[in-house]
Amino acid sequence: MLLEVLQAAEAGGFILIQDSVQCCGRGILRCCINAALKRDEDVHVLGFESPETEVCAGLDSSFAQKLHFHKGFPDPLGWRGKSSFTVQQFTSQHITQLIRDSQPAKASVLVVDSLSLVLRHHDPVIVCQSLQELRKGGVVKTIIGLLHSDLHLQGIVGIVCHLASTVISVAPTNNERHAVATTTRRTKSGKVMQEEEYFSVSEDATLSVQSKPRQHDRVEKEQDSAEVDPASNLTFNLRLSEEERRAKEKVALPFVFSQEKKSALLRPTPGSGRIMYEPDANDDFDEEDPDDDLDV
């Protein structure tokens, strides 16, 4: 699924790459840029955290005219006046005008590196509104953002993830050459798909993906390889022999009311008392006697 997301970015989509201090997601961000350039799309990068040399390292130089890097590093707040685009300018109006000034032939791909710096200096609601306006404005085809989830409250992370159409969460593994990516994709029909995959990023921003084996498949293989009888090591026997089964069936249970006991209780005995009753004309007689079914 990870390769499908990179190779076929849908119009109006918002791809969110979620990482932490344990595993960086900028490698997948570079792969997204590389895939968009190979699709002959204009890419605008708002670089607040990393220099252009680091973000664009390994990209094909033949696509240099399609890549527009708007420098926000190392002065993202514009205190020294050395940035071409600052965090304060992160609004749908400023970004739309920035893209239109480059006169693209078609809708462009917007890359934000990273949304964490923007969220630290803007109201999260305003940031989400700006992202939603950019998705529907027609100038931006796809938004790709990097978010450091361990720098924000879970509520803020949840709001941004809810806005995204695809969320890629990266985490480390025991193997230093690979990391694991959990891709959650929500289609326009509302269907949600999720898949975990191992991935690695080469120096030329090429993504290699390997499917992660499912947990229940491994459990089934272990059960098939070594099936253990749970009653093999018990100190008592759970099974009855044929003789024991016949003896069990002959035992009269105390709570069973047999026909012999019933007849003995209903048979009158000498010297027993009787109740003689003659109904009176004023007696209330109910034809539907609720006790009529009692055998007394």
Curated annotation (Swiss-Prot):
Nucleus is among the record's keywords: yes
Pfam families: Elong_Iki1 (PF10483)
A cellular-component GO term for this protein: cytosol
Keyword Nucleus appears in the UniProt entry: yes
Bias type Basic and acidic residues, positions: 214-224
InterPro entries from the UniProt entry: Elp5, P-loop_NTPase
Pathway: tRNA modification; 5-methoxycarbonylmethyl-2-thiouridine-tRNA biosynthesis
GO BP annotations, alphabetical order: positive regulation of cell migration; tRNA modification; tRNA wobble uridine modification
Primary localization class, coarse: nucleus
Comp. bias regions, Acidic residues: 280-296
Similarity comment: Belongs to the ELP5 family.
Protein name (database record): Elongator complex protein 5
Organism of this sequence: Danio rerio
